Amino acid sequence: MYTVIPTARFEKDIKYYIKKKRYFHIGEDIRQITNELQQGHLVGTEIPGLKISNHGHIFKVRSINTDTHSGQSNGYRILYYAISEELKIYLLTIYSKKDDNNIPSDGRPSCPHPRNPYKM
């Protein structure tokens, strides 16, 4: 079993969607994905060329947003970092596909910490 650890950025993103966007079912919507990750199923697509270290891989996975009634294609995107040797998965960020214009064009999620954007 993997340990799934939400980063401070991920928790901040969740709070934003609950408070500002009023997506009250976000926890239920992503629960299936976090359960899969705990079982060691690295769901989603690996993002090549985006590395934090040589020991892990970054993935992007789609999730439904039941608050918008628009399915997975316009649902959430979750970026996570998997370290197989340590059996740990760090949830990096979550964003709504409807808000993807807030994601920088170079493909990196915006982060407040300039040296290590995924400080854990």
Model-assigned labels for residue ranges:
Residues 73-78:
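Short, surface-exposed coil-to-beta transition loops
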